[in-house]
A protein has these predicted regions:
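Catalytic histidine-centered segment of alpha/beta-hydrolase-like enzymes
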Residues: 255-264, 268
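N-terminal cap/lid segment of alpha/beta-hydrolase-fold proteins
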Residues: 1-12
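Conserved serine/cysteine hydrolase catalytic core
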Residues: 183-242, 251
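Conserved alpha/beta-hydrolase catalytic His-Asp/Glu region
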Residues: 148-205
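Conserved hydrolase catalytic core segment
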Residues: 88-132
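Active-site loop/oxyanion-hole signature of alpha/beta-hydrolase fold enzymes
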Residues: 57-94, 269
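Conserved HGGG/HGGXW glycine-rich cap/lid loop of the alpha/beta-hydrolase fold
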Residues: 11-62
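The conserved beta1-alpha1 loop
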Residues: 27-31, 96, 225
Length: 275
């Protein structure tokens, strides 16, 4: 994997690149608070067949940070800008949570850009869920603001996250990748790459407009969900897949929102099946 840089709205954004230039194109978009490198196992495995690029969204990984955004279109625009930078007229894409929701919003803008989408529990809230967040706030934003931002070292961070109850179901390699790509060394020790304020602002931003554009998504789309999703409304998922006979909604038994970190082998199998 090689790390690259490009400019987006005055920000320096980073992405990981792997695979042959003359193979089919594949874009990967990560979840809120994480980074492209958390999906290193997908990048490495799929680079045998694809030219893979995985973006660090602004404020994540090695990309420059900002609080200067007002909705999630900021993130879908970054994905489209990266494909423009790469000269990709058409590609397939994998997204998780924020990354999945941002890819779907990007497909609303330009569905011809994408051949296939495989999105894991994408954040696509219903009208009522959006209204709740607007009125009462998102509980996840409160969790993000309270997140510990600094550590004495990356080694200490690895010990903490390896034992943390929230990571109990994660594979060991996934925890190691999180510390490698989402925590950076500083002169004082180590800190989160994604500042709690950025993560919280992302969780707090909801809007209705994209729900009126779901019919624009015409490309083959596979929505991979846990038995019960808290972030992707059933009717939204159905509306997304209704315009392409190859599209589908796939519920994975005994899985959760963080499946790509809890079962990497199964995640790769699912991706390989649908791409």
């Amino acid at each position: 994997m090689q790390r690259r840089i490009f400019e987006f709205q005055g920000l320096r954004l980073s992405y990981l690149e792997a695979g042959g230039q003359n193979t089919s194109k594949l874009l990967i978009a990560h979840a809120n608070g994480y980074a492209a490198g958390c999906y290193d196992y997908l990048i490495t495995a799929l680079a045998e067949r694809y030219h893979v690029c995985a973006l660090d969204f602004a404020g994540h990984g090695e990309s420059q940070s900002t609080l200067g955004f007002s909705n999630w279109n900021f993130f879908s625009a970054q994905l489209l800008a990266l494909t423009d930078h790469l000269g990709w007229q058409r590609c397939s894409a994998i997204g998780h949570s924020l990354g999945g929701g941002s890819l779907l919003r990007a497909a609303e803008v330009d569905h011809r850009r994408f051949e296939k989408l495989v999105v894991f529990d994408p954040v696509m809230l219903s009208f009522l869920m959006i209204l709740y967040v607007k009125l009462f706030g998102n509980p996840m934003a409160k969790v993000a603001r309270a997140r510990r931002p600094t550590f004495s070292s990356k080694e200490q961070a690895l010990k903490i996250f390896s034992r943390h109850p929230a990571n109990r179901s994660w594979e060991r390699e996934a925890v190691a990748a999180y510390v490698e790509y989402c925590i950076r060394a500083t002169t004082q020790g180590a800190e989160l790459c994604c500042a709690p304020a950025v993560e919280a602002q992302i969780f707090s931003q909801t809007e209705f407009a994209h729900l009126f554009k779901l019919g624009r998504i015409r490309n083959e789309t596979h929505i991979v969900l846990p038995p019960k999703s808290n972030v992707c409304a059933d009717w939204v998922a159905r509306k997304i897949v209704r315009h392409n006979r190859q599209s589908g909604i796939h519920r994975i038994p005994d899985s959760g929102h963080l499946l790509p970190f809890e079962n990497r082998r199964l995640t790769l199998e699912i991706v390989s099946r649908f791409l």
